[in-house]
A protein has these predicted regions:
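Short Cys/His-rich zinc-binding micro-motifs
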Residues: 13-29
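Contiguous, function-dense segments enriched for cysteine-driven chemistry
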Residues: 13-16, 45, 82-85, 102
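Cysteine-centered loop/knuckle micro-motif
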Residues: 33-35
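Surface-exposed, charged secondary-structure patches
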Residues: 84-122
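Short beta-strand edge/turn micro-motifs at domain boundaries
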Residues: 124-145
Length: 145
């Protein structure tokens, strides 16, 4: 997911994710045991899909620092558009290619469901991930909608 900063919008408090909250990425674990470990720097993504899920959760938690930290330096923007009116609802991973522990690159196709101004929508994207200095990072994406 690659939402870049756009025009200024009214701000709202970030959605509250407690350590015991279900992880936004959709895996059957608490936020603290799943993507929260990556967001806090206590673990690193071992696959491209794990990084994709953690980045989706970072969008849901409005964790701009994590999003920028996991973005390839060649394509990283100065800031990320974290629209306060948008609420991420759920993530569907549609397919993956490579992106495993022994790969140097991989792709993840996914659909991210959201609500904005009381209307539901979905973003379908095919994201590319590469290893940079040994860690998985987001490179770029092709919107599929």
């Amino acid at each position: 997911m690659s939402r870049r900063r756009s025009a200024a919008r009214p701000t709202a408090p970030a959605p509250r994710l407690l350590p015991s909250s279900p992880c936004p990425c959709g895996l059957p674990a608490s936020y603290a045991e799943c993507c929260g470990r990556l967001h806090r720097g206590q673990a690193a993504a071992t696959t491209a899909e794990a990084l994709m899920r953690s980045r989706y959760s970072a969008f849901a938690a409005r964790d701009e620092a994590y999003l920028l930290r996991t973005w390839h330096p060649d394509t990283r923007p100065d800031s990320v558009d974290l629209d306060p009116a948008l609420r991420w609802l759920r993530l569907e991973v549609l397919s993956t290619t490579e992106g495993g522990p022994f790969h140097a690159e991989g792709t993840v196709a996914f659909r991210a469901h959201y609500t904005e101004a009381r209307e539901e929508g979905a973003l379908t994207e095919h994201s590319r991930f590469v290893r940079h200095e040994g860690a998985w990072v987001y490179l770029d994406a092709l919107a599929l909608d």
